[in-house]
């Protein structure tokens, strides 16, 4: 069995997990998430309140789906209890971010400000003019929104200017040699 897939998924108090055919719905204090399970995989609820992900055979694809499904359901439970956050930093002279209602307005060296609207289930928090946080209950959506914002002005390798994840190391290059 998959080493990750065979681990039981603990369901904390205050979280309600419903298994309806191939659909798993997780309700918690922060919201509701739904996931459709791939064909050969099954999810069972045990008497002790944990979830068990099972697979029928040891085919390569099935083994991969086994661990993936277990991790996705565990992330759904974490999302509806604690939520997920991704912190981004802005480096560069004149580069900054400010909140405009629920939107973010970036000054990134373009001739115009760039406005980013949060999709449903995502919220933004501006900590300083050069640091902000993307919050949400869906880990995939939080990461996707953060990656799209980073794409607006990727960190460039010569001066390191741009939008980066907190703690990200930007590989620097040496500039051209002068005379």
From Swiss-Prot:
Subunit and interaction comment: Part of the 50S ribosomal subunit.
Entry-linked SUPFAM superfamilies: Ribosomal protein L6
InterPro entries: Ribosomal_uL6-like (IPR000702), Ribosomal_uL6-like_a/b-dom_sf (IPR036789), Ribosomal_uL6_a/b-dom (IPR020040), Ribosomal_uL6_bac-type (IPR019906), Ribosomal_uL6_CS (IPR002358)
Family: Belongs to the universal ribosomal protein uL6 family.
Taxon lineage: Bacteria, Bacillati, Actinomycetota, Actinomycetes, Acidothermales
Protein name per its UniProtKB record: Large ribosomal subunit protein uL6
TM spans (from-to): none
GO cellular component assignments: cytosolic large ribosomal subunit
Species of the source: Acidothermus cellulolyticus (strain ATCC 43068 / DSM 8971 / 11B)
Claim: Ribonucleoprotein is one of the keywords in the record: yes
Parts forming coiled coils: none
Protein function: This protein binds to the 23S rRNA, and is important in its secondary structure. It is located near the subunit interface in the base of the L7/L12 stalk, and near the tRNA binding site of the peptidyltransferase center.
Molecular function terms, GO-annotated: rRNA binding; structural constituent of ribosome
Keyword Ribosomal protein: yes
Keywords, sorted A to Z: Ribonucleoprotein, Ribosomal protein, RNA-binding, rRNA-binding
């Amino acid at each position: 069995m998959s080493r990750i897939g065979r681990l039981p998924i603990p369901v904390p108090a205050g979280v309600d997990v419903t298994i309806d055919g191939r659909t798993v719905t997780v309700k918690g204090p922060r919201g509701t998430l739904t996931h459709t399970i791939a064909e050969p995989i099954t999810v069972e609820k045990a008497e002790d309140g944990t979830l068990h992900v099972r697979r029928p055979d040891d085919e390569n694809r099935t083994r991969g789906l086994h661990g993936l499904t277990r991790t996705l359901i565990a992330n759904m439970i974490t999302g509806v209890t604690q939520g997920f956050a991704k912190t981004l930093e802005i480096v560069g002279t004149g580069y900054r971010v400010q909140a405009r209602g629920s939107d973010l307005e970036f000054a990134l060296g373009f001739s115009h400000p760039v406005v980013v609207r949060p999709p449903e289930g995502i919220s933004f928090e501006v900590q300083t003019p050069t640091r902000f946080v993307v919050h949400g209950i869906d880990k995939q959506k939080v990461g996707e929104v953060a990656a799209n914002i980073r794409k607006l002005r990727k960190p460039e390798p010569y001066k390191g200017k741009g939008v980066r994840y907190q703690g990200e190391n930007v590989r620097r290059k040496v500039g051209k040699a002068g005379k």
